[in-house]
Structure formats: C-alpha cells, structure tokens
C-alpha cells in the first residue's frame, strides 16, 4: 500500500487541476462579459421612436436620446442615430458633446439601412425649447478637452426655423415666401411649424458651438437651415477641423466662423470644402454689417477654403478683415480660396481691411489679393439657372430685391417742438423704418435639394 501522504498529494494535485480549469473557465466567461460590455459602450444605437433611456443602447434595445448616448458612451464610441427629432434630454434644446465620439445620423428605425436624406435625423427645436435651452453655447455644443482625439458629426439636419420669432403683423413678407421677416432678438412674435404659436422669443445661439475643444473635428453631410445666429461658431483648440459636404441655407451673421484657441504655440487648421452656402443675412434688419458665408478668423489658425458654392450674402461671400495684432504672425497666416463658385453676393465676393471702410473685392480680382496664399480656379456665376427647380424662387426673388428704408418726419409747429425751440433745445421727430425681407423662414425640406446640385462644387450627393 502506498504512503497516505503520497495519496494526499495526488488528490491535492487533481483538485488543483480542477481549480485551475474552473478558474480558467470563470476568467473566460468574465472576459466575454467584459468584451460585450465594452462593445456596448463602443457602439450605441439611438431611436426617438422605439428607444428608451433605460435600455442598454444595443441595436435591439436602443436609447431614446443622443444626449443619453453621449453620457453613457466610452471615448471613441460610435453612436448610430435613427430618423426622428433630437434636441436634448426632455427636449430642453441643447445637446452637449463632452466626449470624443462619432455621431452618425440617417438610419432607418431598425438600423438596417442608412440614407441621410430619406431617414431624416433632425435637430429641430420647438418654440417651447427656447425657455429651457442654455443661454450660452449652441443647439449642439462641443466640450472636449482631450487632445489627439476626434469628434465626428455626420448626417444630422439642423433647423431652427420653428423656434424663431417672426413678425406677428406679417411685415417683411414677399409674395410666396413662407413667413414674415425674423424679429429682432428680444422681440416676441409668432413661430412654430404652422406659425400659430404666439409670444415666441428667438434664442440667440449658434447651431454648433465649439467651446475651445482640444479634439479634432469633422462635420460632414449635415444641413444647417434657418439659423438665427451662425451655423458653426466658436474657438477651436485641436489640430484640424474639417467642414465638408454640408449645406448652409438662410443663416444670420455667417455660416462658419472659427477662431483659434487651445495652446497659443500650436497651429490649427480649418478645411472648409464642398459646402453650399446660400442666403447669409446681416446682423440686423437694416442689412448693415455681417452677412458672410465664411470668415477667416485669427488665433494662430490657417484656413483652406475650396470647392464651395458661396452666394446670396447680404455683405460678402468670404471675409478676411480680421488681422493678428502681431504683424509677423499675421504675415505667417495661411488663408486660401480655390476652385469656389461665387454668385450674387451683394457687396462683394471678398472683404479686406481698408481705410476705415472694408474693401470689396470681386472674384475676378482674387489673384491680386496678397492675403490669399492660393486663389486659383475660382469662378463667378451671374445666373442661378443651374438651381432651377432646386432653389425656392419666391425666396430668391425676395432676397434679390430686399431693401431697407427709413422715413424721418418732424413737425416744427408741434407744441413740444415750439417749447424746445424756445428753450434752445433740439427739436424732435419720428423715424419710421421698414424692410422688405429679413431672414424669413426657408422651407427646410426644399433646402435638402441642394445636395448634389452641381458636380464638383458645393455639397455633393451623400454617400451613405
């Protein structure tokens, strides 16, 4: 008979083998569970129609809101968004992107197919959201402080037309245009889809606001329609921002204005390519300042603008009036304009600093502009027939004839003026002002026709 201690060692060895196998099995199960969990965080699905924020965010159990998906996502996650309307949790009016993620819109409700212009993923706030939206930032605000990461916004349709205040008296409404003129910020008016909501107040925020994010940014295949205060605006602290294959229709101030942020010794780049920018309106209804398609801003940032269609601006298509305070830095700036089409910009295709008044430059003279490092291939198009059947003709006609006028009246025989005259004071009068059109609502579904309007220029057909 063998030594009992030997038998015990054999038993212990077998138990150890069993324990090892059990441990390995347990570790394998845990690894699979962890992988599944990480996968769920790295790929999230959102549907306003079938989702619930208590779901796990899988394709079969999507979340309801983009904001919720961002909140639970891991860094570098991809968020797939089905057709529907999304403007914040509880429809508050804001989406805050606080992590480097990719947001991909344009999916069918069951996520079996993607077609950005068929399965419309909207960011279209209501008038009610004006009361709850944050006062600063934008309808979507990018707040990412991690360098060497990227945010992608792809296939979203931003439209603020329903939440804007329009003139309740019907002033400034050319024949056939969808709405009266936009009210000044702070003036109550009508709004909503059918213009039946009263006491609407416009929120003066951008559509996408860059809150000095340190990540790289790509915005593509998106629509920006009826913006009361910029489409894309803010400070950029990453390395490269790419704004490509988008449409910007009926935007107040400017379609795109990005300044350099981040570290002062780091050079940033903006690439603005293959975009269609039409109907850029001035700051106010007197059609005075602003009203640009694209602005070359400062802050150690280079701008590359190419293959765009930029037209129908109340001031100019592109603006290069901003300069660095340090002349050496300003001389080192790179600003380009290549292979763009300009047409019917009211005061010029490009503005430059000059003698207390801005210089207005037409596209034919771009080669003489020292501030443009490259300026080849640009064209002027005087006749917008290429957009026949695409552009809203009543809106176009109203824009081309838009005008502002003031009428001053003063009655020297009025009692108050006789008194003021006797006292050696200036007499008073009244000024009546009127405008034929100002930032009226553009039909957002019609605006989507501009995708693919001209081969090689502006927004092209979307590759889903």
Identify the meaning behind each predicted range.
Residues 1-43:
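Bacterial Sec-dependent N-terminal signal peptides
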Residues 39-68, 85:
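Right-handed parallel beta-helix/beta-solenoid
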Residues 67, 75-102, 106-113, 140:
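N-terminal extracellular ligand-recognition/capping segment immediately after the signal peptide
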Residues 81, 88, 97, 105, ...:
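Extracellular beta-strand solenoids
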Residues 90-92, 113, 127-128, 136-141, ...:
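Short glycine/acidic-rich loop motifs that flank beta-strands on beta-rich extracellular proteins
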Residues 100-195:
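Right-handed parallel beta-helix/beta-spiral solenoid domain characteristic of secreted/periplasmic
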Residues 105, 149-162, 179-196, 214-226, ...:
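Right-handed parallel beta-helix
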Residues 112, 116-121, 329-464:
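Acidic, glycine- and Ser/Thr-rich low-complexity intrinsically disordered tracts
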